[in-house]
Amino acid sequence: MHLPTFPRAMPVTRRVQTDFRGYDHRPGCPEGGIYEMTNGSAADAPLFSTRPGRTLTYPTGGGSANGLFAVDGGLLWCTGQTLYFNGTPVDGCTLVNGPKVFAELGGTVLIWPDKVWYRPDMGTFGSAEPSWSGTVALQRSDDSSGARADSVAASGIDTPFRVGDAVTFSGFSTPEDNGTYIIRAIAGAVLVFDPDTFSAVGAVEHITVTRRMPLALHACTYANRIWACAQDTVWCTKLGDPLSWYWYEADDNGTIATAAWSVDVGTPGN
């Protein structure tokens, strides 16, 4: 089979360029100049080089840098007492001026030692260790008779907490009423717990209710939990919930795989 050929009108030549004249976007661009250039640089002329990587510069407000954390969609850091997300101060969020520890799960970032949560997608923040103090009345959540109570009622007691939170009571005059219990329901200004949790229906007490959070020196995310440690103690959250640290309960099958977890080790860490 014979294929057509093109006659060679010019001899084969070889050209070596030893002089780089930089970027020159003019019709008369000389030999050695570059008319079009992408990601190149003339900074090292007469040598040709690629440009350095681009960087973003954010304002720091002039304070001391206390922590930096990469989160989905941007960069979070603390300078002085101000929390920044992608260079914009988080309005109303004032932190302690000092080193920070960050960890994130499910779009919620936890910040220590302030014990604050922040959600970058919504721009919202709040206390990761909410607490309420005041006078409560112990009562039953149903109409059944009985001497023991399963709920506490007080104006505003429902605001800081969620159904399913494990909250710790302190201040009861009856010591056995103090402890950590899981909120089963919230009915207006009433927190409902398991039947017969508290000792006496009708009692009026001044107490404190807190959803506790450990004071971590180091934290990370692994296996759909946030893990934290300080000195000789390691904690992890309830599975999938970055705000539940002292939630210890088995499911209907007796499985505790979703519960929070903590352990004291023999030797403190550094």
Predicted regions located by residue number:
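Recognizes the extracellular SEMA beta-propeller fold with strongest preference
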Residues: M1-N270
